[in-house]
Amino acid sequence: MTLILLIEQIFNGVQYGLMLFLMAVGVTLVFGIMRVINLAHGSLFMIGGYLLMQSLAWTGSYALAVPLAFIASALVAIVLEVIVLRPLYRRGPLDQVLATFGLTLFFNEAVTVIWGREAIPLMIPPLLSGAVEIIPGAVYPVYRLVITGVAIVAGMLLYFLITRTRIGALIRAGSDNREIVAALGINISLLYTLVFALSAMLAALAGIMMGPLLSVEPGIGDPILITTLVVVVIGGIGSVRGALVGALMVGLFDTLSRVLIPLVFTTNATSALVNIAIYVLMAVVLLFSRTGLFAAHRG
């Protein structure tokens, strides 16, 4: 493998890792505050892609379609939290897992009924369809660089929200001890709705940005969800910092393994080795730390 190819794959790995971070931090926030493992999180990724496609059909402009899809995704999440999740907060973890898994099945069938089973390709915005030379001899797509930049900005805004605002203080306090937050007279129901909407917006943002790179189709969020859960386990359940580190680890490890493993192993099992690479990484991390790299400590 040439140095140029290695550099390009590292860029791909970082971009993929940052997308996984947007997904994983949403799962982390929901679990940290609401104590719910949301198995419907991948569906929110899928919904973001479909809403972008529909918004493009209505407006014909990415400048209008992207914010429209983003806002619509947040509204879907608010309705979902109020109607479906809110009655489950006092139920056991099994009920919550079954309910959110049922939502995944529901959304997969719903988009099939509305838009059909066929994969729907989305065009990359013409303004971002070119490529730039990142180093002499290495050309990289502009759109992937934009995705990386947007994900970094989103992460910085999230960091500012959590560490520098009143809402962020409530999120951090609720993550440590939600009983005390409730005792202080804070509207926990509203806090839950805001947290779930924020997590859904991050997942939808990932789906919106990945839509032009992937064909939008029913179930597109399912494999993303599985990888996201691997990221959360590696980083530590409930840890935002762990979500970032775990996402970058998985993104780089998965991307580079798909290039390096076929160079080392030329057997029929090569594809299987590539597919299990991130699970091997997860097993190694758990071997040394049963709670992940940065497990959150709760009061």
Model-derived features: where do they sit?
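Transmembrane helix-bundle core of multi-pass membrane transporters
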Residues: 88, 93-164, 191, 263-277, ...
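Hydrophobic core segments of alpha-helical transmembrane domains in multi-pass membrane transport
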Residues: 49-54, 70-76, 103-111, 150-159, ...
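Membrane-embedded helix boundary and interhelical linker motif in transport proteins
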Residues: 11, 33-79, 83, 260-268
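Membrane-interfacial amphipathic/re-entrant helices at transmembrane-helix boundaries
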Residues: 1-22, 51, 59-65, 91-97, ...
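Alpha-helical transmembrane segments within multi-pass membrane transporters and channels
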Residues: 60-103, 110, 245-250, 254, ...
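Transmembrane alpha-helical segments in multi-pass inner-membrane proteins
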Residues: 60-62, 66-71, 193-203, 207-208, ...
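Short, non-helical or kinked segments that cap or interrupt transmembrane helices
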Residues: 27-49, 90-95, 167-170, 188, ...
